[in-house]
């Protein structure tokens, strides 16, 4: 299944929105709604459906543990198949970009290298994107990546390594922790979220229309 948000008028293009470890929850739905309000068809595929249908939690420590447990049951290849299906559906609206947050940032980074049909990708603090294995991937579309300098999961050294290995990738660092874009988390950083969002939108306008 997937959450779909349609723009009011003719779409400028499409954005596939990839969830965090918390499922396609109210926050991810609101992110998709936001891109629809900016003129894009937004589709958020429920990547956890393969392991547990309709999984959706909040942000307590217990929720984090539950989310991680389900994530561990979803193989990357399976997730990328679902991304591919979403890209195919979204293509009716024009060029397709992908944006992902946390685990979804990792999925978006891998999709940029492995899923055909993407015009651009925007991973937000993708956990796992700074491993040697992920850095060895070769993105086949334009990429803009957002990271927080205070991210306790992703060391800045790793981000610098990724940036050095991929000069064509635009990498932005913010004085913020992991999850800074999510206004339902304690780690929310309004100023960084706003700046990252405006940069992402500008990037989508350039790459998608």
Task: For each feature predicted by the language model, list its residue ranges.
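N-terminal cap/leader regions of alpha/beta-hydrolase-fold enzymes
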Residues: 1-209
């Amino acid at each position: 299944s997937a959450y779909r948000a349609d723009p009011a008028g003719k779409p400028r293009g499409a954005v596939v929105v990839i969830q965090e470890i918390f499922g396609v929850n109210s926050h991810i739905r609101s992110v998709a709604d936001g891109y629809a309000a900016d003129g894009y068809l937004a589709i958020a595929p429920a990547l956890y459906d393969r392991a547990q249908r309709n999984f959706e939690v909040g942000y307590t420590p217990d929720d984090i543990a539950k989310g991680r447990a389900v994530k561990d049951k979803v193989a990357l290849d399976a997730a990328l198949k679902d991304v591919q299906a979403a890209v195919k559906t979204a293509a009716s609206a024009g060029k397709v970009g992908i944006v992902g947050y946390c685990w979804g940032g990792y999925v978006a980074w891998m999709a940029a290298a492995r899923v055909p049909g993407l015009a651009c990708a925007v991973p937000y603090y993708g956990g796992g994107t700074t491993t040697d294995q992920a850095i060895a991937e070769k993105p086949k579309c334009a990429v803009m990546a957002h990271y927080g300098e205070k991210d306790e999961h992703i060391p800045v050294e790793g981000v610098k390594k990724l940036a050095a290995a991929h000069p064509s990738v635009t990498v932005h660092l913010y004085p913020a922790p992991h999850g800074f874009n999510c206004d339902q988390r304690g780690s929310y950083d309004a100023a960084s979220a706003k700046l990252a969002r405006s940069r992402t939108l500008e990037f989508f306008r350039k790459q998608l229309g």
